[in-house]
Structure formats: structure tokens, C-alpha cells
């Protein structure tokens, strides 16, 4: 049987394989926003203020960055921000070198960008030049600038003019920042000590020999941005001119920042032959060849040379970016970046034998960290399986990443294993490995399970994908798709072996967490299939009490297995109500989905504008009427409709679709149809998945309701009385329409109760569980994420361990429900697709239990759950397009 292939062609790949549509207006706060009151700390006389004046930055400012990245970037970009920028010392965040032309031509843009960074608690150090301004004044005096090896020859007259110009340009930038409410400090001396570079040749040009950090540290302690000139002094006080690029580099050697950024009007280095901007330069591989290029001369040659000498002294993770002013935030906060990124790169070693890598490292990467499908349970078994294969192995210098390619069939090499330590996913080592693979193999194929971590990264690196044999098959460079078809047909025994291995092996700590000790600390339980529990009586001991009598609930014994894919046919989706937070998150999920694609997005407010963050094709917002909707349905142009509309608005559209007698699916995210028996209730983990697969009308549950039902279902038969649910949501749950519930001026240092009785979710929870509950919602100052503290009166006594085991057994095999022993936290669950259940407190009487649930209201509470329901109704794997933690 021929296998239907879907060739997904991606365009516009940039630096790390993903293109993000970033609007500067999203990132550059306007003056009225930036000019907010800054945090002022109080300290006793003589007490030294901490180096970071915002030891606890305003939480909503951090949320702003995370929210922006969630909208325009990838999960890895959010992780990079959280990992680096929320922990990096303020003075080590970034050094930004500003060319003189930037201050003349783009002062407002520069000031807004710097003010934004400062507003979210970051303190970039600015070093600026003034070359064009200096040349202009010299030209008015009929003085021709002289250069040698890219260095300005500075005589006494030039030095005198330079001093005046530097002070004026420094004052301009400081004043522009102060007007935006951002405190800035001019530092025009006392930082750089220099000696004459070559007095006879260059005259008053210096070579920096010492950097005094104190003025910079004092500036940051005072809560001001340090703005430095590139002038230096000798030990005796003689003023010397120093190239601003060199000055920024010398400062970076001392401070060792995460990023060094050079702003220039061209927005990067331009290849003199192709006239195109260079996206990236890996110096370890490209430096020698680059310096021989005829177009690399004068200032360009000096710049590249100085950058190499700088990066040779910094950690390998450091980089230098040459970008335009408007792309500053994009470079700092997204992995796609902008302009030209220069780094040393990561040395990738090549081997022909698995024995070239130490067994301990290889076992960790292949058995525990491997993202690709592999049936081996031990390193020995893995090696035995491949002993007759021709292999090519790639690893980094520290053996923290490995890729293994089977080259036995040279016409279609297969990537068998790809394992990497967590930090290597964040610092782009994996990208260096893939770049090397693409250089060595014009075509390559690999396979992943739907639950694989970093699935979206592998998707972004491919040119085609197909779901078959319960795997995602990815490839690039394959021209003859019959090869793919034949490989997939022959791969079924391998797929069956994977499934058999997973269904029989006992759970291990490594299957749940990368750190064995964390499973003991958090008491998280790893999941396997239900057959394990029916065979293993020891693991089922928690279901029995004195005398072997079972009394725990039948709900705890239910196992609803996720459904496998029965289709790989692409589907066109229309999103009505795309302006809100849920709509934006759903757009992001569909953007990386292997089969779904948007055909229309409807928003009255945004009609006619381009849809950001969607790269499969260019789409503009439209404003669809009920007649438009009916016509599209009659034409059969749409496979699925998602209604992301406010409560009470959906019905006219549903009626229009129904009148057209179409066959498309409707997933409604509002509360309008949650109580309609003719609609399926879309909470797959607690309902009939087959019914959802066969339904054309699905009502998406509410966010509070999803978390509450997950928190109560395993113990329904033990409840004695009315449970009470104390719910707190981030302000994204209040929507985008301005109100006190999403006004940060009201929410800061505050918690607002609302709808104290008869909230729609109280009714929904009670209706679905057939158990009355009391629900009290609150809104807090964080952006997204919900915590639910559920108090449950019990009929019979129970211990905390027995309670936890009920939940573990009920949600065994559900990848989007995580059960843990300790209390789950909102910040750990935010931006994650799963629900976390934990705490499991039991009163000393044993008759009252408290369960804590966290859920991301925009993902599993809305967009992720909608995608689950779309996947089921369209016949796809339930978790297609969903990253499983």
C-alpha cells in the first residue's frame, strides 16, 4: 500500500531554523508606559546597596517579557530568558556599543529600546562612539580624516574636537533616556586607563591596559544606566582616543557579559560580494577563510579581528551581535535573533565507533537523554543492535551531546539517536551539531514519538514530515519521496518493538526526570501502561486496606487510553476571535502542528492587519460575518472551526454553520454549549475519547473547571458533603478588555476575589461531576497560571500516601496530568501544557483532605485542550503539535 506523504516546505529559515515575526511596537514600550515610577530601596546610613537595585524586580515586568516571548517566539526562547536574564547579575547582562551615526539618526529608537530593557530590570552598559559627528566638524574645518589599519590617526586638533563631540553626544543620549523616565548616568572618564598605541604612527590613540569597574557598579547600584564614551586616559591624565569597538571589547573582557551587541546603521556585516547580510559567523571554523576574502578590509577587518580576540577570552557561550537599533530586543530575547551573530561556535567531534565516547556519557545520552525513538533498555543492548551497522557519531567536546547516524544505506542516512544535556538545548550546541550533520549529509531522516521532548525543534529543522506507525518521521533533502514511503513500510517491526518495550518495562526515575534525585524530592511518579498495574500486585497494594478489602473509588481504577492516529490528512482551520490571549496561543500551536493550517483568522478590531507569529503562510485578519461563515461551510473550504469568542456570542455562527449542513468540526471555547447534551464535553482525560473522535460539536471546558475536575475525579465516591475550591488566576484570565481584574495598578500587591457565588465554573464543575461544589475565584498580579486549593470532606479515613496513590493510579498513562507529592506551584506550571496535582494533605482525623492543582489557563485550560479536541476530531494523534514535558 502506498503511503500518503505530506511534504511541508518551510521558507525564510534564519539563524537557528525558525523565523519569528517580531514587531518592534510589541517590544518597545512607549514613553508613557516606560515613564513609570522606579523601585526605590531604603538603606541604613553606611550600608552598601546591593549591586542589583531590583533584587526583586516588579513581577509584572518579568511577566511582560515572558508574555511577549510566548507570543512571538518559541518555548526555548522563554526558557533562555528565564534561565539567563532572570538570574544573570545586572551588570553582566549585556554591553551595547553604539555607533555615532545611531545617536544622530536613531536617537529616539535607541532611547526607547534601552528604556524598555531597564524597565524590566536589566542594566545594559552602553559604550558609544562619535565618528560621523567628528568627521563632519573636521570637514567644516577642511581637515581630512586619516586612517591606518582602520584606526583613526588622532592629532592634537582632532583630539580637542573629539573630546567636545563625545561629551555632547553622551549628553544627548542621557537626556533622551531621562525624558522617558529612565535614569541614566554619563560616565565620560575614570573607567579606561590606556597607554599610547604607537605615538609616532597614531599620535593620541590609546591602547587600554586597565578597566576600572567602580563607576559602572556605582551607577547600577544607584539604579541608573551607565552611558560611557570611548575616551581613555593615561596614568598621568593625558586624554587618548580609543576605537569604540575596542573599548567595548576591553570592557567585556572584564565584565564577561552574556551578550556583546554592536549597533550600526547597516544592521549587520554585509558580504562584499553577494551584498547580503551575513546571518552568523562561527569563528573557530570560518575565521581564517573570512580574513582572506578581498572585501574584508579596513574597519571590517579590524572589527572581526578584535571580536575574535575578545571571544577567545570569554566563555564559549558568549557571542557578539552586530545589529540595527530596531532589532535590539529581538537579538536579546529571541533565538532567531537579528543582524550578524558572531561566536566561536562549538567544536563538534566526529567518530566512526561508539567506543570513542566514554560509556558513562554515552549511556546517559542514549538511554536517558535521547530524543529519538530507540527500543534499547541498556547501552550494551544498543551497541549489540548496531554492531553490524556503519555508523557516524558526532559529539561535543564535553560529551554532553551526541548524534548517531546510520550510513549503511548511503542513499538515505538515518539519524538513530540524538541526545543532549538540558543546557545544550538552551545554548545552541544542538544547533551546531545539526549544522554539522547538514554539511556532511545532504539528506537525512529521523523518527520521533509524539511524546518526545523538543518535538517542535525537530519539526523546525525538517523539510517534510509524516505520521505513521505511531511515529513522526522527519526528513530534509530527500527528493524521491518513494524512499521515504519504502522506509516507513519497512520500519513497522521497529515501531512494534518500541511499543512492546514500553508496555513491558517497569517505570524508572529517568523516565520521568533527568535528575534521579529530583524524583525523590518531588515524589513524582513515572507512568507506564495499565497492563503493568494489573500484573504487578505489589504496585497495587495501595488499593487494599485491612483484611484485603477494597474500598477506594471505582473512578481511581478507570483507564482511558489516549487514541492513536487514524489520519494524516491536512486540515484547514478557521479561528473566530483571534485577538485574545487564547487565540494567540492557539495560533502558535497550529503554527508548529504537522497537519493543521489556518485558512482564516477573524477579528473585528484587527481586520486588514497581518497575522504575527504565523509562518506557514502570510495571513491577514478578516472580519467574518455569519453569512461569510455559512458560505465557507457550503463550499467545503474549512475542516474545523474554533470559536474563541466571549460568552453569548457564539450561537449565531453555530446556527449559520448548522444551516449549511456541512461536515466540519466546531470547537467552542466559550461556556455557551458546556451544558448542552448534544455537544461533547472536551476534557479527554475524564470523558469518552471515542465520542470526541466521532463528534462534530465539541465544547471546550473552562480553565478553572478543568483543574477542579482533575482534582476531584479520583475521589468522587469518597466525598462526604460539599467540597470547597479556592481558585486564584493570573490576570490573563480576565481577558484583554480593560477592567480592574487586569489592571496592574489595581492588582499590584493585591488579590481580588470576584463572583463570590454562582460563578459559571461552579455550575460547570458541579454539573459535570454530579457533585455540588463551592467555588470562590480570585485574580492575582501574575500574568498566566491558576492554582486551586481544594478542601474535601471524606466519608472514610485515609492517609496522605493512600490519597496520592489514588491519583497516581487514576492518571497513569495521561501525559498531560502530572501527579507529585509536594505542592505544585504556579510558576512551575506556567507555559506548560499539563495539569499538576499534588499536596495531598490529610487532616489528623483522616476525614478531610486538601488537594492542590495548578494549570496554565491559556494552555491546558484553553488552547492546548482545544488542540487535543481538534486532533481527536480530525483523526490525528491526540498530542500532535503538543510538547509533552
UniProtKB/Swiss-Prot annotation:
Gene name per UniProt: arg11
Extract the GO molecular function terms from the UniProt entry. Answer: acetylglutamate kinase activity; ATP binding; N-acetyl-gamma-glutamyl-phosphate reductase activity; NAD binding; NADP+ binding
Which Pfam families does the UniProt entry name for this protein?
A: AA_kinase, NAT, Semialdhyde_dh, Semialdhyde_dhC_1
The protein's name is Protein arg11, mitochondrial
* Domain N-acetyltransferase residue range list: 346-499
Q: Which NCBIfam families match?
A: argB, argC
Q: What is its EC number?
A: 1.2.1.38, 2.7.2.8
Documented effect of changing residue 261 to D: In strain: 975
